[in-house]
Swiss-Prot record:
Gene designation: LTP1
Function: Plant non-specific lipid-transfer proteins transfer phospholipids as well as galactolipids across membranes. May play a role in wax or cutin deposition in the cell walls of expanding epidermal cells and certain secretory tissues.
Entry annotated with the keyword Transmembrane helix: no
UniProt KW keywords: Disulfide bond, Lipid-binding, Signal, Transport
PANTHER family (alphabetical): NON-SPECIFIC LIPID-TRANSFER PROTEIN 2-RELATED (PTHR33076)
Lineage summary: Eukaryota, Viridiplantae, Streptophyta, Embryophyta, Tracheophyta
Name this polypeptide is given: Non-specific lipid-transfer protein 1
Highest taxon above the source species: Eukaryota
Gene Ontology molecular function: lipid binding
GO BP annotations listed: lipid transport
SMART domains: AAI (SM00499)
Length: 117
Protein backbone atom coordinates (compact mmCIF):
# COMPACT_ATOMS: atom_id res chain seq x y z
CA UNK A 1 0.00 0.00 0.00
CA UNK A 2 2.82 2.41 0.84
CA UNK A 3 4.39 1.70 -2.56
CA UNK A 4 1.12 2.57 -4.29
CA UNK A 5 0.89 5.84 -2.37
CA UNK A 6 4.48 6.70 -3.31
CA UNK A 7 3.82 5.86 -6.97
CA UNK A 8 0.69 8.03 -6.91
CA UNK A 9 2.70 10.89 -5.43
CA UNK A 10 5.34 10.40 -8.12
CA UNK A 11 2.75 10.57 -10.90
CA UNK A 12 1.10 13.62 -9.34
CA UNK A 13 4.44 15.40 -8.95
CA UNK A 14 5.30 14.67 -12.56
CA UNK A 15 1.99 16.05 -13.77
CA UNK A 16 2.41 19.21 -11.71
CA UNK A 17 5.93 19.77 -13.01
CA UNK A 18 4.97 19.06 -16.62
CA UNK A 19 1.73 21.02 -16.57
CA UNK A 20 3.12 24.50 -17.24
CA UNK A 21 5.83 23.29 -19.60
CA UNK A 22 5.03 23.87 -23.25
CA UNK A 23 7.40 21.92 -25.47
CA UNK A 24 7.28 19.83 -28.59
CA UNK A 25 8.07 16.76 -26.55
CA UNK A 26 6.04 13.64 -27.16
CA UNK A 27 6.94 12.16 -23.77
CA UNK A 28 4.65 12.76 -20.83
CA UNK A 29 5.56 12.53 -17.17
CA UNK A 30 3.03 9.72 -16.91
CA UNK A 31 5.06 7.76 -19.44
CA UNK A 32 8.29 8.53 -17.60
CA UNK A 33 6.93 7.57 -14.18
CA UNK A 34 5.25 4.46 -15.59
CA UNK A 35 8.52 3.25 -17.02
CA UNK A 36 10.35 3.87 -13.75
CA UNK A 37 7.72 2.60 -11.31
CA UNK A 38 9.69 -0.61 -10.72
CA UNK A 39 12.66 1.49 -9.53
CA UNK A 40 10.93 3.11 -6.53
CA UNK A 41 12.07 0.56 -3.92
CA UNK A 42 15.63 0.63 -5.23
CA UNK A 43 15.77 4.42 -5.17
CA UNK A 44 14.00 5.11 -1.88
CA UNK A 45 14.36 2.02 0.32
CA UNK A 46 17.77 0.70 -0.73
CA UNK A 47 16.16 -2.45 -2.10
CA UNK A 48 17.66 -4.63 -4.82
CA UNK A 49 17.74 -3.40 -8.42
CA UNK A 50 14.82 -5.17 -10.12
CA UNK A 51 15.12 -6.29 -13.74
CA UNK A 52 11.89 -4.40 -14.49
CA UNK A 53 13.54 -1.18 -13.38
CA UNK A 54 16.33 -1.54 -15.93
CA UNK A 55 13.81 -2.52 -18.59
CA UNK A 56 11.98 0.75 -17.87
CA UNK A 57 15.19 2.79 -17.92
CA UNK A 58 16.12 1.25 -21.29
CA UNK A 59 12.62 1.81 -22.70
CA UNK A 60 12.63 5.42 -21.56
CA UNK A 61 16.05 6.03 -23.08
CA UNK A 62 14.85 4.55 -26.37
CA UNK A 63 11.79 6.83 -26.37
CA UNK A 64 13.75 10.02 -25.64
CA UNK A 65 15.45 10.48 -29.01
CA UNK A 66 14.94 14.20 -29.63
CA UNK A 67 16.22 17.13 -27.58
CA UNK A 68 12.68 18.14 -26.50
CA UNK A 69 11.96 14.57 -25.42
CA UNK A 70 15.22 14.31 -23.46
CA UNK A 71 14.55 17.67 -21.79
CA UNK A 72 11.00 16.63 -20.93
CA UNK A 73 12.16 13.29 -19.49
CA UNK A 74 14.76 15.21 -17.47
CA UNK A 75 12.11 17.61 -16.11
CA UNK A 76 9.90 14.69 -15.13
CA UNK A 77 12.82 12.97 -13.38
CA UNK A 78 13.78 16.14 -11.50
CA UNK A 79 10.16 16.62 -10.42
CA UNK A 80 9.93 13.02 -9.30
CA UNK A 81 13.25 13.23 -7.46
CA UNK A 82 12.02 16.28 -5.56
CA UNK A 83 8.78 14.49 -4.66
CA UNK A 84 10.62 11.77 -2.72
CA UNK A 85 12.38 13.05 0.41
CA UNK A 86 13.82 9.56 0.99
CA UNK A 87 15.40 9.39 -2.46
CA UNK A 88 18.92 7.97 -2.37
CA UNK A 89 20.70 10.59 -4.51
CA UNK A 90 23.69 8.37 -5.26
CA UNK A 91 21.46 5.53 -6.46
CA UNK A 92 19.41 7.93 -8.60
CA UNK A 93 22.53 9.38 -10.21
CA UNK A 94 23.96 5.92 -10.79
CA UNK A 95 20.76 4.27 -12.03
CA UNK A 96 21.45 4.58 -15.77
CA UNK A 97 24.96 3.13 -15.38
CA UNK A 98 23.67 0.33 -13.14
CA UNK A 99 21.27 -0.55 -15.95
CA UNK A 100 23.91 -0.26 -18.69
CA UNK A 101 22.29 2.83 -20.21
CA UNK A 102 24.05 6.09 -21.08
CA UNK A 103 21.98 9.26 -20.74
CA UNK A 104 23.29 12.79 -21.41
CA UNK A 105 22.59 14.15 -17.91
CA UNK A 106 22.73 13.27 -14.23
CA UNK A 107 19.52 12.29 -12.47
CA UNK A 108 19.34 14.60 -9.48
CA UNK A 109 17.08 17.09 -7.75
CA UNK A 110 19.03 20.01 -9.24
CA UNK A 111 19.75 19.01 -12.85
CA UNK A 112 19.43 21.92 -15.31
CA UNK A 113 17.24 20.26 -17.93
CA UNK A 114 17.50 23.23 -20.31
CA UNK A 115 21.12 22.28 -20.93
CA UNK A 116 20.23 18.72 -21.99
CA UNK A 117 20.72 18.12 -25.71
Amino acid sequence: MAGLVKLSCLVLACMIVAGPIATNAALSCGTVSGNLAACIGYLTQNGPLPRGCCTGVTNLNNMARTTPDRQQACRCLVGAANAFPTLNAARAAGLPKACGVNIPYKISKSTNCNSVR
